[in-house]
Each structure stands twice: as C-alpha cells, then as structure tokens.
C-alpha cells in the first residue's frame, strides 16, 4: 500500500533555530520541501561561546516565524501535515524546552501527533534522508559539541563504538581560532589559514593513539597550541602571518591524523558484522573540513568501504534531519504526545557507559 507522509520538524538544541518540512512516499526517497535556519552567531560572538540564556530567548522569539516560513516555502498549511517532530534532547535545556513547548502548542491546536527526536539521531539518520542507504552503516558525528562513532542499525537502534572523553573537535577548532585572533566560527578560519602553512613546523600530539579503543581526546591539542603560541610570542614579541598559518596547519594535521586512525579502528569493528553495503557516513559541522574528508575518503578506499558526507547545509544543525528522523519513528508507530519532556542528556546507545565531559555546544551523550 502506497503511503505519503509529510512532517514538520523543529530544531533548537543549541544556537540555530530551525524548521523544515519533509515528505516521503512509500518506495521513494524522502524529499525536503523546505528548510529554514536562523543562526545566532552574532548574538554570541562577544562572549566567546554560546550563552544558554541568550540562546533560549532567541529560540522563543524565532520559532513561530520559522514555522510560518517553512510552511510557506513548502506551499503547505498545518492541515497538510501528518505529524510534527521536535528535538527533545540532548542539548542546552532552555533551547530544547523552547522547541518542545512550541511543538506541543501546535499539536494541541491541530491534533497532529507529536514525536520527540534525539538530536544525535537526526544527524545519524541524515544519510538515509540524502542517499537512502540501508542499515547498518557506520556514522562519525563530528561537530562543535559531539564526536562519536555509531553503528546505525535502525531508526532507534545504535551501537556506540567510542567518542570523545573531553572536548569535541569543533570546540578545539573554535578555541584555536580565538587563541590566534581568527574569526569565528573557528573551523573555516583555521582551515583557510592552514592552506598557507607548513604542517611539519610544529608537531602536535596525536591523543590516545596508544590506546586500542575508539575513544578520542582533543583538550590536550588546545593546551599544546597555547604553549606553542606563547613560546613564539616570548621569543619574537608576536606572531607573524606565517606563524599563524603553520600553527593552524600543524593543529589541523593532528586532528586529521587522529580521526583517520580512530576511524580505521571503528571501521574494522563495524566490518566484523559483514554488512552487505559497507558505508562510512560523516555529519556535523567539522565534517565540512576538506582535509578531514580527504583523509576519511582515502581510508574508505583502502578498506573498500563507501564514503558518504551529506551537503554542508545538512551536516550542521537543521530541522530537515529532525523531520526525517521523526518520519522514521512515525512509521514504527512511535507517538509521544503531551508527556514529551526536554532532556539535556540522551544517549543513543543506552548500553554504553557515559562519555566524560561536556562540550561548549551542549552536553555529551
């Protein structure tokens, strides 16, 4: 029996307010009818990081207009929807609550079913939205607030192989940019500087490569960079443009080498299951880094595994991924209703021990 489902998704777990409409017909690839994102970079730039209270107020102010714009772009009304999906965690609790309250209001007014979505599941299921790949696949979520290796086995079934025990790589990129006086967000700024630098001039540590597991650590890289910067300033009285470029190149090379080696270990564990179509998918803002993508692509070629990276707009936080993850849950019969609550922490793999630490852009899960 052919069925067409249309869902509205809401996302407000950090510093992006987003709404989107996704539609899927049985047997066909899902289609993004609209995707609206309001960023908050300017609101937080003076503070060196996301301020939860400011973020929550901005979400509350923008969610209604986000929903209106998403419906208008899709050419639909609330009456054309089958359900509403909303990020219910993990994330900054004030922002998550704003989204959940907005979704509950729409559900109460329209009678639409309400479906809570794990923000990380939204990222993890994005490859199925963009490329309709089959389970199981290996997911590397690498962003400002998270870094995890997950085997996606179903819309709500994930096995975590490892993750960061302290800071996320995106947080390390942002801190590096601040230490070197580069613009935020740090990822693009550091990458741009690194293109003109020598990655061999400054040798950064490759954290935890002496361990056989898939866990990562990035806090030590920030400390190493700060010490190198301070030493240069003490010796020369300041940093030249070339000093900055070389520091960025060395730092980025350490991130790439660490991720490639840890991903090699995660892929070997994943491939033990002998998946029919072996695939490594990456998502999160840091996945936009060209050197990281190139390193992972070369690794996948070596291990005869497909490599998939969604478009940048779907790597960073967005509501299309939430709508699609909600659509997958909807098809399993999941409904949450008014009992849905916001959750600051929400691990995808409940059987794995908790990861240590909390990133600048939200709690680790």
Curated annotation (Swiss-Prot):
Instruction: Spell out the Pfam families in the cross-references.
Output: TsaD
Recorded catalytic reaction(s): these are: L-threonylcarbamoyladenylate + adenosine(37) in tRNA = N(6)-L-threonylcarbamoyladenosine(37) in tRNA + AMP + H(+)
Q: Does the keyword Cytoplasm apply?
A: yes
Which top class of enzyme applies to this chain? transferase
Give the cofactors, semicolon-separated. Answer: Fe(2+)
Q: What is its main location?
A: cytoplasm
Question: Where do the annotations place Fe cation binding?
Answer: 119, 123, 317
Q: How is the cofactor bound?
A: Binds 1 Fe(2+) ion per subunit.
Recorded hits in SUPFAM superfamilies, A to Z, give: Actin-like ATPase domain
| Annotated binding of substrate, by residue | 141-145, 174, 187, 289
Q: What does this protein do?
A: Required for the formation of a threonylcarbamoyl group on adenosine at position 37 (t(6)A37) in tRNAs that read codons beginning with adenine. Is involved in the transfer of the threonylcarbamoyl moiety of threonylcarbamoyl-AMP (TC-AMP) to the N6 group of A37, together with TsaE and TsaB. TsaD likely plays a direct catalytic role in this reaction.
**Full protein name:** tRNA N6-adenosine threonylcarbamoyltransferase
Q: What species does this protein belong to?
A: Ruegeria sp. (strain TM1040)
């Amino acid at each position: 029996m052919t069925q067409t489902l249309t869902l509205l998704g809401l996302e407000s777990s950090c510093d992006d307010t987003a709404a989107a409409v996704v539609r899927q017909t049985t047997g066909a690839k899902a289609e993004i009818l609209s995707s609206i994102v309001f960023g908050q970079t300017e609101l937080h730039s003076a503070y060196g990081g996301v301020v939860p209270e400011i973020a929550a107020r901005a979400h509350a102010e923008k969610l209604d207009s986000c929903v209106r714009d998403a419906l208008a772009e899709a050419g639909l009304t609330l009456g054309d929807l089958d359900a509403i999906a909303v990020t219910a965690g993990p994330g900054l609790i004030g922002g998550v609550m704003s989204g959940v309250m907005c979704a509950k209001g729409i559900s109460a007014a329209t009678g639409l079913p309400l479906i809570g979505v794990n923000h990380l599941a939204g990222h993890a299921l994005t490859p199925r939205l963009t490329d309709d790949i089959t389970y199981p696949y290996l997911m590397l979520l690498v962003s400002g607030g998270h870094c995890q290796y997950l085997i996606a086995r179903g819309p709500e079934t994930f096995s975590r192989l490892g993750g960061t025990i302290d800071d996320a790589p995106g947080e390390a990129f942002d801190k590096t940019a601040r230490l070197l006086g580069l613009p935020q967000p740090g990822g693009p700024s550091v990458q741009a500087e690194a293109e003109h630098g020598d990655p061999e001039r400054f040798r950064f540590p490759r954290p935890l490569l002496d361990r056989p597991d898939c866990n990562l650590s990035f806090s030590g890289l920030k400390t190493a960079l700060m010490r190198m910067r301070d030493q240069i300033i003490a010796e020369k009285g300041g940093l030249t443009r070339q000093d900055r470029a070389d520091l960025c190149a060395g730092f980025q090379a350490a991130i790439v080498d660490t991720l490639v080696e840890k991903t090699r270990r995660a892929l070997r564990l994943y491939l033990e299951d002998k998946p029919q179509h072996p695939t490594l998918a990456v998502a999160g803002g840091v996945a936009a880094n060209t050197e990281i993508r190139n390193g992972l692509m070369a690794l996948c070629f070596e291990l005869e595994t497909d490599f998939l990276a969604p478009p940048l707009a779907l790597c960073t936080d967005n509501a299309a991924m939430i709508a699609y993850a909600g659509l997958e849950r909807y098809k399993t019969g999941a409904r949450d209703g008014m009992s849905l609550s916001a959750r600051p922490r929400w691990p995808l793999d409940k059987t794995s021990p908790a990861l240590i630490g909390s990133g600048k852009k939200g709690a680790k899960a």
